[in-house]
């Protein structure tokens, strides 16, 4: 019966499962219902793995299944009495985390994303709170894996098996009945926030939680210098298929260099709300960008019919701002729905005269290092 319920929930999640940032309610609902704090000594009957051990077992299972090059869509459906535990390191209060939270075993180990599938999680899952996760019936996957010489590892995450497994390996849990049988909160009065770990070297392109203690963890990196580069993927129509070339506009440094535009396409904020998107669009700074990816070109944004369509379908967009330091490149990725999306990056940072110290969750995407801020206070100009 448990398997049937999980399968039905996964099918329902298909309608809403997506890795794109979405609007997050950042207010406060009525006080949550009281719950009985979880007592692991009474309730945990199986084996408790560390997050690193779980990640290593996932990689091993993928190898056994001959799926080491298919990690983008392959997942391990756990059918053993296995558990993980950890303290919550993130909050969705600022809107930069969507339907999930991260946990760490301790300050020295890696972390992992728990794809709960609910919004306003900060009301029920507090930073520093210990949670236990029953893995039996859930799926372990990896988001952001890309095969080939130009790819690399992503980040191991926990959710349900994605029903389609075409774009993603896992989906959000979402169903409260299933959440309550897998995600267990310990005493809310025992909050012990994990301290950020200072790192001076970045993980390599082939690292995930199985091989690097920094992946999924709350870290602090100092001395990051702006690289005059940003990445934004804009859709001509957000209601149409987002994998069609004729619906996509890649604002990348490579494309900017081809047309003599700034490497960041003039995007000097951490992300962009709908109003900020329109401000950038109407300024003309993107007029030389074109619809389509690679060699495809379905017209420049300067064309009235294309700009008009973008104006009518305006939306908030995530942005990755690039910085160099710690022996490599770091993308600071921010949601267009975060409270600080339109916050201007300091001019002295943009012109390279000052660097920043940043704290956030370190993740891997196609072999590149990304950092997700918890709030705007995670950036300090040096």
Residue ranges and their predicted role:
Residues 1-4:
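Positively charged n-region of N-terminal signal peptides that target proteins for export
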Residues 14-17:
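C-terminal motif of bacterial Sec signal peptides marking the signal peptidase cleavage site
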Residues 19-98, 102-382:
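OB-fold nucleic-acid-binding modules
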């Amino acid at each position: 019966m448990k398997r049937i319920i999980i399968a039905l929930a996964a099918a329902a999640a298909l309608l809403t499962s997506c890795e794109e940032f979405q609007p997050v309610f950042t207010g406060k609902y009525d006080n949550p219902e009281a719950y009985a704090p979880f007592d692991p000594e009474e309730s945990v009957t199986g084996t408790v793995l560390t997050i690193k051990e779980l990640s290593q077992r996932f990689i091993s299972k993928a190898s056994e299944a001959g799926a080491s090059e298919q990690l983008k869509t392959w997942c391990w459906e756990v059918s053993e009495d296995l558990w993980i535990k950890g303290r919550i390191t993130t909050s969705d209060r600022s809107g930069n985390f969507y339907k999930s939270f991260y946990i760490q075993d301790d300050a020295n180990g890696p972390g992992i994303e728990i794809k709960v599938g609910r919004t306003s999680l900060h009301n029920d899952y507090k930073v520093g709170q210990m949670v236990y996760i029953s893995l039996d019936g859930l799926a372990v996957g990896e988001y952001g894996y890309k095969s080939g010489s130009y790819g690399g590892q992503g980040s191991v995450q926990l959710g349900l098996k994605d029903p389609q497994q075409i774009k993603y390996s896992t989906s959000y849990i979402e169903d409260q009945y299933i959440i309550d049988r897998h995600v267990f909160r310990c005493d809310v009065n025992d909050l012990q926030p994990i301290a950020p770990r200072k790192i001076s070297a970045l993980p390599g392109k082939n690292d995930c939680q199985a091989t690097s203690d920094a992946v999924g963890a709350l870290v602090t990196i100092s001395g990051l210098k702006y690289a005059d580069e940003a990445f934004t993927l804009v859709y001509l129509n957000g209601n149409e298929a987002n994998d069609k070339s004729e619906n996509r506009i890649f604002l990348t440094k490579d494309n900017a260099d081809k047309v003599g535009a700034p490497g960041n396409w003039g995007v000097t904020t951490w992300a962009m709300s709908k109003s900020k998107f329109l401000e950038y669009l109407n300024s003309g700074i993107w007029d030389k960008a074109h619809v389509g990816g690679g060699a495809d070109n379905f017209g420049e944004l300067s064309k009235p019919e294309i700009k008009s369509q973008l104006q009518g379908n305006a939306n908030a967009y995530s942005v990755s701002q690039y910085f160099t330091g710690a022996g490599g490149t770091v993308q600071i990725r921010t949601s267009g729905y975060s409270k600080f999306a339109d916050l201007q990056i300091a001019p002295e940072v943009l012109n390279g005269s000052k660097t920043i110290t940043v704290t956030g969750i370190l993740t891997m995407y196609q072999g590149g290092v990304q950092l997700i801020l918890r709030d705007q206070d995670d950036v300090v100009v040096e």
